[in-house]
């Protein structure tokens, strides 16, 4: 299952072959401009990847995994035009930076040239809705694309606890509330469960975190089943136990092993993605590359890729109901509740 965490990083997914810095090697190849950018009003820096690849007539294999061919020379004129309720407010000129912590992938690594801005982006409100046009001047064309800004100050997680009590096994799913984000096309929901693990009596307690992907939820569907002014997602307690059993390695008791549960062990993470991103994910299989035969979906006028927006809401919550005593009762799992205490001896 595709996780939004990966989608929101959005590497250009395609098949590549070796290439040389010799430009003549690309004489028979057509240049493909590519843009990936997701604006986030809660981020202190927003990055946009502006790059290119090459392919030949009838050849679905793209080339350009090294910086000499993938990067456009110099610094392009790239800017964001900010709109409020449809009126142009300001232009933000993007600067460039090279990052050196990119993991190995289809593009060259570890260094990547990115365009960025540290200009604060305003939040949407009931009376003011923001959007952005990205304009990139290439030597032979102008790339343009548009995105509505996702999110607002009130977008957040509402419920204060999750309840994995066994009395709800194989019954109706449990519900969890959050406030919607303006201009969101969909949401992806994750939970994490963190506990301390001590494998020997004199050993250190090491944090361990189980990640649980709940799913992708369409804004249109959520809006048709609201609780007051909140959206709801659902989870099943039996799925939590199954995930946790797999994560800790089964039911077999390990001599001397202890696991400690604190007051707020679960974090709920809800990421809202823009409508442009929803359309891109819906229309493109990220495992495929672009070719003339693919007719790949793109909202970039003059290029490929996606330009959209996102915002993440998160909250640490308690374990409700009988969840804690029931976990402690699973003796082979070795759990003990310590609340907010640092001393768990």
Regions found by a protein language model. Name each.
Residues 20-345:
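A sequence/structural signal for flexible, mid-protein segments enriched
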Residues 1-4, 21:
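Positively charged n-region of N-terminal signal peptides that target proteins for export
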